[in-house]
Amino acid sequence: MERSAVRPYRLLQRRKKDVPIVAQSTETTDWVSRFADEVIEESERRAPGKPVVVASGLSPSGPIHLGNLREVMTPHLVADEVRRRGHRVRHLISWDDYDRYRKVPADVPGVDKTWSEHIGKPLTSVPAPKGSAHPNWAEHFKAAMVESLAELGVEFDGISQTAQYTSGVYREQILHAMKHRGDIDAILGQYRTKKAPAKKQQQKPVDEAELEAAEGSGAAGEDDGSSGAAGYFPYKPYCGNCEKDFTTVTSYDDDSTELTYACTECGFSETVRLNEFNRGKLVWKVDWPMRWAYEGVIFEPSGVDHSSPGSSFQVGGQIVGIFGGEQPIGPMYAFVGISGMAKMSSSKGGVPTPGDALKIMEPQLLRWLYARRRPNQSFKIAFDQEIQRLYDEWDRLDAKVDDGSALPGDVAAHSRAVGTADGELPRTPRPLPYRTLASVADITGGHTDQALRILSDLDPSNPLGSLDEARPRYDKAEAWINNHVPADQRTIVRAEPDAELLKSLDEQGQRSLRLLLDGLAANWSLDGLTHLVYGVPKVQAGFSADATPKELPPEIKTAQRSFFALLYHLLVGRDTGPRLPTLLLAVGQDRVRALLGE
């Protein structure tokens, strides 16, 4: 179905009668628009009148992490832009669930070392972790990703490679590859003897995460195919006895399609007819280009491990011609990091997934992080204090878009973040500052009535009717506080006044508290308390509370820091804590007065 969409960064242009109005790009474009231009043009050249096909590939070999999400978000954003312009488009996600189980990921609940017995089997033949509701390993990890993609508004057609191979969908392609195995071997041979180019001086050395990612991808050398005494074969059977792929093809007859293989794991051997045998797959460097041709893929990005010289994307660009297809437009995408952690690799457990991120941030923010950076730019997703700064940046952008002051590229990224061609994603009705919500959740410790009271005090002229108005953002901030803030950084309000500290205060310290206490009632709102706590040191120094930094000597900043530290010590027994206006609101006026010695 053709769709039209109106977006702030687009111009609508009426075409001739009976032609739908579609969204047209403005001259100022972002990376998504530029790829969409290229993809539409290429699709019309290759397959005029047919839906544009973009693709992603995900291997459910373990938790599917936030780096893998870039494999999906890059084509999703391009597909969505194509759809906004009124074109039909399919976003395929190939679940590589017929891949071999390579290793047991660490730190996966319900999994122990006994899972190593299944190494070499298809992922769909490996048991799911203990306690899982899913029938096998692949379905267990696929399910979590499907749920996250739904929350992110990603529309796709999923293809199980287990289903494709075991039902014989690719039979003709397999027979064709076997018939042309000499041509495939010759292409692969061009790269087997080449050494990787020396890394440039300014490049960082490959870290363990990158090596792990390469090992878990089609860049691994073993995905080249076997070349034993009987020659090269681009096809690998799974053993009929142990189900593993420790097999070697020992003979093949093109006319009869009789194939004999032996398993080095269990010693089993058999002869089958490949024109009716469905328990095996093409090796990765042949499988991928075969699928490009079979599905007519126009756009599919790949990670740096697939894009290096001699790796699967480069080699596939030559092999795809054997299947009568063309290589897709395929930008390389960079690694995605986590604040405070090394680059991610899904062959390790314990690495944050999209589901983990969506517990602490709204889908709009996560979409924005992927939309605002070109695929070849690396970026980090924050699970530490940095998330508060990211949310501040997002809220500022939101305000600029609303008042028309945002730059066109930023407007485009914002539009892609808040919705798709099908409409806007559900959003928080009253998006209060994330850092404020986090502080309130921290201090109230799950008491929703107390949280509502404090949040209503933020703006007494427009109080919250219920906590639902601040959801789901409030729930995300609460989850971040509860799961990602170390215990020693949590805020615990003092139960009793610090009598010793209060007694030790000099006249200036006592006067600062008096000025604050005298102004509490009249300034009991977020803005009012902000003005008050910054104003007390100004007034003490003989300036107006409204004086700007330019009108003040540098020592006022020092006095403010000392005053803030005093308040933190009296309220929470530490040098620092949540922003003071939020903390004061959270503690409540009566308790603040008691803790400050009134």
What are these regions (language model features)?
Residues 2-51, 63-64, 90-92, 202-203, ...:
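Basic, alpha-helical terminal appendages of large translation-related enzymes
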Residues 6-10, 154-354:
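Active-site cores that bind ATP or allylic diphosphates and position pyrophosphate for catalysis
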Residues 20-109, 289-308:
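N-terminal catalytic cores of NTP/NDP-binding nucleotidyl/phosphoryl-transfer enzymes
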Residues 62-69, 124-135, 160-162, 166, ...:
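The substrate-binding groove and active-site-proximal loops of carbohydrate-active enzymes
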Residues 85-87, 144-157:
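A structural motif corresponding to the C-terminal end of an alpha-helix
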Residues 98-116, 173-174, 342-349:
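Charged, often glycine-rich, active-site loop that binds/positions anionic groups
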Residues 113-134, 148, 152:
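A glycine-rich helix N-cap at a beta->alpha junction
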Residues 308, 313, 323, 334-486, ...:
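Catalytic adenosine-cofactor/nucleotide-binding cores of aminoacyl-tRNA synthetases and other
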